[in-house]
Amino acid sequence: MAALTDGPPGADGRAVADRILVDPVPMSRLTREGRAFVVTHETVHVTWRAHLAGQAPIWLQEGFADWVGYEGTGLAPEVIATDALAAVRRDGVPGSVPSTESFSAAGAAIQSEYQRSWVLVDLLIAQHGLPKILDLIEVATTQGAPNDAERAADAALASVLGTSRAEVTSAWQQRLASLAGSPATR
């Protein structure tokens, strides 16, 4: 991991003194563009945590931070999601969106989770537009445990986007399969 965001929450649950912690060894292995991506990604977390109390599902947090980091780079989805698409070709599409537990993986497995999350957020932005996804983030962010965030996201998907987790998951699986050139079954 090249960097992470950390800091204490204030009385209202919003971050009051976040900082981006950089590990110089992994950062030194990145290209200039890679370093810019990492700093942008972490800056999204700082901004999110300063303005919204609590947390959203990890797929939304990490997928959106990656989306902002990659926006404007001109990289193709197949390049951005290389590890995730290799996993789809090998194992088929995942049965569910990335979870807190799946983000505890190491190596290429964790990269796949970030990339799967990016594909999901990229798909939602393509379908609904960035303003709606910003609304989704606000409504889906809640104080409490990760399961509370998942329930808040389910409610936000319905109220903000007029869809359900099942519909979003199905569209995401189809998108992964299409990008991987693989059938959408597992």
Give the location of each predicted region.
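Active-site scaffold of zinc-dependent metalloenzymes
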Residues: 2-36, 40-50
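Acidic/His/Gly-enriched intrinsically disordered linker/tail segments
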Residues: 12-17, 34, 38, 52-186
